[in-house]
């Protein structure tokens, strides 16, 4: 409210309706100094939402290159605004983006099975 964004930006807070929210987005903007592998970025790509990410998000997190633009925080507000404008003009098939995420090795079925196996192996060695 202080910044006068209430008509342009929605701050959801906690929600259990992430897929519905992602489907409604025009763009996903994620400025960050440093990240590991942010699930929200992966979910946005899987939903086919154009993403603008900081270079603080590792390239490993870019599963859908045609839907993602990365730039440094130091590029400034103008460069970020331009990147958001480009994201808003991107047109691609959301199903194609979801397929790209699966093909990149981030399918929940594959990663859940791998993680289960990893923990079971770890438990056996203890």
Question: Which residues does each predicted region cover?
Answer:
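Nucleotide-activated donor-binding/catalytic signature segment of Leloir-type glycosyltransferases, i.e.
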Residues: 1-13
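Aromatic "clamp/platform" in nucleotide-sugar-dependent glycosyltransferases that forms part
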Residues: 14, 33
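Short alpha-helical segment that forms part of, or immediately flanks, the ligand-binding pocket
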Residues: 19, 38, 42-46
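An anion/phosphate-binding loop that grips the pyrophosphate of nucleotide cofactors and donors
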Residues: 25
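Short hydrophobic beta-strand element within catalytic cores of glycosyltransferases
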Residues: 50-55
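A charged, aromatic-enriched C-terminal amphipathic alpha-helix characteristic of glycosyltransferases
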Residues: 91-124
């Amino acid at each position: 409210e202080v910044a006068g964004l209430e008509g342009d930006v929605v701050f959801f807070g906690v929600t259990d309706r992430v897929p519905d929210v992602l489907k409604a987005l025009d763009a996903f903007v994620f400025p960050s100094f440093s990240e590991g592998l942010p699930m929200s970025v992966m979910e946005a790509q899987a939903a086919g939402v154009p993403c603008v990410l900081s270079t603080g998000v590792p390239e490993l997190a870019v599963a859908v290159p045609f839907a993602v633009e990365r730039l440094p925080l130091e590029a400034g507000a103008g460069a970020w605004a331009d990147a958001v404008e480009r994201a808003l003009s991107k047109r691609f098939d959301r199903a194609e983006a979801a397929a790209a995420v699966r093909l990149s090795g981030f399918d929940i079925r594959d990663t859940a099975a791998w993680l289960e196996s990893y923990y079971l192996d770890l438990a056996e060695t203890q």
